[in-house]
């Protein structure tokens, strides 16, 4: 056992070499050691740092590209929707103006025709005038009802399903037949 302890005892007599530590005095330090450490850190750290920055840059660029594409798609869809809205508004305005002006024209034409007929006829022909007025009024009613029916059918065609539309038509035909068969 003595042989095992002897080497440790002899170590206690050796003078210590100073050990590791940091020397903050620049004049006492070896300038080569810190420069080597700094060079190694810069050399290896530069590659890692540049890779991290490149990856981050690519992610940012991809995000920007995706955002721009989504924005362009949304703008295109918005423009298409606006163009479609303008078309529909113009068509609606045309239908409204044409329908109203046609009804007014026909009404004015019939009133003018009735007025002319009244001017041409004299007092003894009041019955003829009355019948012509009734005919003109009936024509106006028919034309107005036709126009209203056309508009109603257009509205029904666009709003109801075909089954409901057919059921409504059949009910109206039945009502019309009963009205035609019923004497006044």
From Swiss-Prot:
CDD domains: ATP-synt_Fo_b. This is ATP synthase subunit b, chloroplastic. It is found in: Plastid, Chloroplast thylakoid membrane. Pfam families: ATP-synt_B. GO terms for cellular component: chloroplast thylakoid membrane; proton-transporting ATP synthase complex. The gene is atpF. Keywords: ATP synthesis, ATP-binding, CF(0), Chloroplast, Hydrogen ion transport, Ion transport, Membrane, Nucleotide-binding, Plastid, Thylakoid, Transmembrane, Transmembrane helix, Transport. PANTHER family: ATP SYNTHASE SUBUNIT B, CHLOROPLASTIC. It comes from the Eukaryota. InterPro entries: ATP_synth_b/b'su_bac/chlpt (IPR002146). It comes from Pinus koraiensis. Its main location: plastid. F-type ATPases have 2 components, F(1) - the catalytic core - and F(0) - the membrane proton channel. F(1) has five subunits: alpha(3), beta(3), gamma(1), delta(1), epsilon(1). F(0) has four main subunits: a(1), b(1), b'(1) and c(10-14). The alpha and beta chains form an alternating ring which encloses part of the gamma chain. F(1) is attached to F(0) by a central stalk formed by the gamma and epsilon chains, while a peripheral stalk is formed by the delta, b and b' chains. F(1)F(0) ATP synthase produces ATP from ADP in the presence of a proton or sodium gradient. F-type ATPases consist of two structural domains, F(1) containing the extramembraneous catalytic core and F(0) containing the membrane proton channel, linked together by a central stalk and a peripheral stalk. During catalysis, ATP synthesis in the catalytic domain of F(1) is coupled via a rotary mechanism of the central stalk subunits to proton translocation. In plastids the F-type ATPase is also known as CF(1)CF(0). It is a single-pass membrane protein. Belongs to the ATPase B chain family. The chain crosses the membrane at residues 31-49.
